[in-house]
């Protein structure tokens, strides 16, 4: 891969994963008749002027099962009968030959084999501390990452410097796979278009939403949807993101969580766990998934809306960095129960016998600290 394959943002936009998180212009507007939030260009800071937040507080927070009408089923069948369009050429191709899904390991191998040296030079693997902060970190901070794991850590941070290149076939397959696994579509879609807004990107081009996390944000989404253990969780969080009152931009929220993972890695919050497992990438992936699970749980149970997003994300970052091991343990327990049909973020509890503990018994780190609160300074800007 040459430098054109990975677009590197300026220091102001992306300084070792600390840059401006997301662009403005992805905010909800309100349909009074249907009580639906649609993200169509109203700045979040302006929501209070449109009566949206007041209206949200008056709605009943009930989960209503949606009945799929025959018209919807027919439309879906007609859509699936349409020939797919290849993103590289824009020409029609046989619907019997859709693009092949790509696994996380295959996508990772792509970055392990191409030349990323121009981007690796620009990373700052750890936070630089001086004075009392350095002394305090030395005496009371987490352990240093083992020397043999630092190359793997640097690869993670280097991928976070790379942007999305729509001309790179691997990049395109990653996007296609994420879209298909979340929507259930069997066919390819254009790499630019309004359909990406349905997944929670800001606009028609997903590349514009990766600042602060780079291509690592897409690799994390790929991991979430291609791992058979985390796919049900990803689908549940995606459904939560489309709730008629509590909806939020799924992919933008995921980018923010990847940014938290980058910061936790650079601040050595994950070093102890990486040293214990003798690997970095799986730990970072699990930390990302565990943090996303915690956010979804708080969002669902505390009835958060988009106006709470800034506060929730700031508190989430503090909690995730403080107690990564507890988050990872919660994820492990949750996935084990989901595999047995005993836990669900959205649906009713399923217990098959007295030995099956309810999902509410899982300990979510710092849950009591996240009280209902609205914040004007949101991260989705």
From Swiss-Prot:
ELMO domain location is 170-324
Its localization reads: Cell projection, Stereocilium; Cell projection, Kinocilium; Cytoplasm, Cytoskeleton
Disease per record is: Deafness, autosomal recessive, 88: A form of non-syndromic deafness characterized by prelingual onset of severe to profound mixed conductive and sensorineural hearing loss.
Q: Which GO terms describe its biological process?
A: auditory receptor cell development; cilium assembly; cytoskeleton organization; gene expression; protein transport; sensory perception of sound; stereocilium maintenance
Q: Which domain of life is it from?
A: Eukaryota
Per the record's keyword annotation, is Transcription regulation included, yes or no?
no
Instruction: Name the encoding gene, please.
Output: ELMOD3
Annotated region Disordered: where?
1-31
* Tissues where this protein is expressed: Both isoform 1 and isoform 6 are widely expressed.
- Organism of origin is Homo sapiens (Human)
What job does this protein perform?
Answer: Acts as a GTPase-activating protein (GAP) for ARL2 with low specific activity.
- What are the GO cellular component annotations? cytoskeleton; Golgi apparatus; kinocilium; stereocilium
Query: Which intervals carry biased composition (Basic and acidic residues)?
Result: 9-19
- Protein name in the entry: ELMO domain-containing protein 3
Q: Does the keyword Cytoplasm apply?
A: yes
Specify the effect of residue 265 to S: In DFNB88; uncertain significance; perturbed subcellular location with loss of targeting to stereocilia and concentration in the nucleus; loss of ARL2 GAP activity
Sorted alphabetically, the keyword list is: Cell projection, Cilium, Cytoplasm, Cytoskeleton, Deafness, GTPase activation, Non-syndromic deafness
Please give one Pfam family short name. ELMO_CED12
